[in-house]
């Protein structure tokens, strides 16, 4: 039997960009910590991607069924910039009428700054859209930067928003260089609702899923408070790209710089993680990522891994009763990927075990605080998603109640895990719940929640 789950994703470190809204604390709490439940395969010199398995507790109670949270982490090594793979980049820029003034000026500035970070190995194209689509710069080597920058400088705002058509055209430009060993990325910028052509999150999301199959990741950048954050995060999520909410257009250059830093640090592509659980362990739910569960095997596909960053998957697992003192093989993980520089296929593996005990103290002392905290934060994010849906339906009091109840669970976890950061997050969430309960959820507030949750679910750095 096959079960699919679309839940969602955190980062080892969070860097606050100049003038960009500070990250919600929840999104910055990942720690690289090993405990008794971990068989560590940390990246070593010459090892491109390492895999490791952890559980929320290294020891669980014996003689009865139990539930465990399994975390499978992929850690990518850093690669010197001179060794990086070439880039196949498409900039997809909204030039509709609402982008007038400072927005279009900052978008031009950010696009030009992005071009200047590329070199002669890289390919670049620029597509602009309003109610029509124009390929301003057909795919070509980035060394033609002076002419490309001149074309970008001519962009002016006008018309409506044919977002789907603009993204589709950018994919056509990227396809001209798909088989050249380059890292494929479209950066889609918009400040408004798609109102020409396909415009629903499902329709545009399907395009993102199709591009994922071609190893094209789509990063979305929403400017202001009038764009559709559900649509933008859907297309990014389905293609394994990043997503940003930029409240002030002045922040666009910093966001483009951050995004190009990610693209230029890709070390692995076409990544498939397979986790096979042993007898006595049944995977029930993927928490935070799109995961496919077939019998006792979980599979997740990622488009790319960035050097120096970690991506992980949380899986809720049911355990058959174990005897006191028994150590059981829990799961085997295998990650297959393509080295982004050499284009050779590679693999990394890991195995995980868990122990059973009647000693309650031994169980309590085996708690893996980082894994438990990440699980708590992801569950809280899912509750915030539920609050957003309730607020959308006009049920603001219920939305506030969901947020307060989830904040209460954060407070309890803060005490049991000795994690004061969770207490701070709970207080912030309670204040937010009071505001939403009295006046509803504003557009900017909704975008913050949706985008922050996306970044948490996807381990996207800020």
Q: What are the roles of these predicted feature ranges?
A:
Residues 1-21:
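N-terminal secretory signal peptides that target proteins for export/translocation
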Residues 26-37:
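Bacterial N-terminal signal peptides
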Residues 43-47, 51-270, 319-325, 408-416, ...:
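Exposed acidic/Ser/Thr-rich ligand/metal-binding surfaces
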Residues 49-51, 68-70, 87-89, 271-273, ...:
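Hydrophobic residues positioned within well-ordered beta-strands of beta-sheet architectures
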Residues 134-137, 278-286, 340-344:
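Short aromatic-acidic-glycine turn motif
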Residues 272, 276-295:
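A surface/secretory-pathway sequence property marking extracellular, secreted
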Residues 287-310:
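Extracellular adhesion/glycan-binding regions together with long Ser/Thr-
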Residues 311, 319-462:
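Long, acidic serine/threonine- and proline-rich intrinsically disordered regions
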């Amino acid at each position: 039997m096959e079960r699919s789950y679309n839940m969602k994703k955190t980062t080892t470190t969070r860097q606050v960009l100049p003038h960009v809204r500070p990250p919600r604390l929840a999104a910055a709490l990942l720690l690289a910590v090993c405990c008794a439940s971990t068989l560590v395969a940390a990246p070593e010199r010459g090892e491109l991607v390492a895999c490791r398995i952890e559980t929320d507790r290294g020891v669980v109670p014996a003689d009865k069924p139990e539930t465990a949270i399994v975390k499978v982490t992929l850690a990518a090594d850093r690669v010197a910039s001179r060794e990086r793979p070439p880039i196949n980049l498409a900039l997809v820029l909204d030039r509709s009428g609402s982008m007038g003034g400072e927005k279009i000026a900052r978008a031009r500035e950010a696009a030009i700054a992005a071009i200047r970070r590329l070199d002669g190995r890289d390919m670049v194209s620029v597509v602009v859209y309003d109610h029509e689509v124009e390929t301003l710069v057909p795919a070509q080597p980035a060394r033609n930067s002076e002419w490309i920058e001149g074309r970008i400088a001519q962009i002016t705002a006008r018309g409506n928003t044919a977002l789907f058509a603009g993204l589709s055209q950018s994919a056509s430009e990227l396809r001209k260089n798909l088989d050249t060993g380059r890292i494929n990325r479209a950066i889609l910028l918009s400040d408004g609702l798609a109102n020409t052509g396909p415009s629903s999150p499902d329709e545009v999301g399907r395009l993102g899923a199709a591009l994922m199959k071609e190893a094209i990741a789509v990063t979305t950048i929403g400017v202001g408070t009038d764009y559709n954050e559900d649509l933008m995060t859907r297309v990014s999520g389905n293609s394994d790209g990043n997503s940003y909410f930029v409240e002030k257009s002045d922040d666009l250059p910093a966001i483009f710089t951050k995004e190009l830093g990610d693209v230029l640090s890709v070390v692995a592509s076409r990544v498939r993680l397979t986790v096979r659980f042993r007898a006595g362990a049944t995977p029930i739910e993927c928490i935070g990522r799109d995961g496919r569960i077939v019998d006792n095997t979980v599979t997740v596909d990622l488009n790319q891994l960035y050097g120096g960053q970690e991506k992980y998957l949380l899986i809720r697992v049911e355990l058959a009763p174990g005897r006191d003192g028994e150590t059981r093989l829990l799961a085997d993980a295998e990650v297959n990927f393509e080295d982004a520089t050499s284009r050779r296929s590679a693999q990394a593996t890991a195995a995980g075990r868990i122990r059973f005990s009647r000693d309650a103290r031994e169980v309590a002392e085996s708690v893996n605080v980082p894994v438990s905290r990440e699980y708590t934060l992801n569950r809280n994010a899912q509750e915030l998603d539920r609050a957003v849906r309730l607020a959308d339906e006009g049920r603001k009091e219920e939305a506030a109640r969901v947020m307060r109840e989830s904040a209460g669970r954060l407070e309890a976890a803060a005490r049991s895990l000795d994690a004061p950061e969770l207490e701070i997050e709970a207080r912030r969430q309670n204040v937010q719940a009071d505001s939403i309960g009295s006046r509803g959820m504003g557009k900017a507030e909704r975008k913050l929640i949706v985008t922050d949750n996306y970044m948490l679910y996807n381990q996207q750095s800020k």
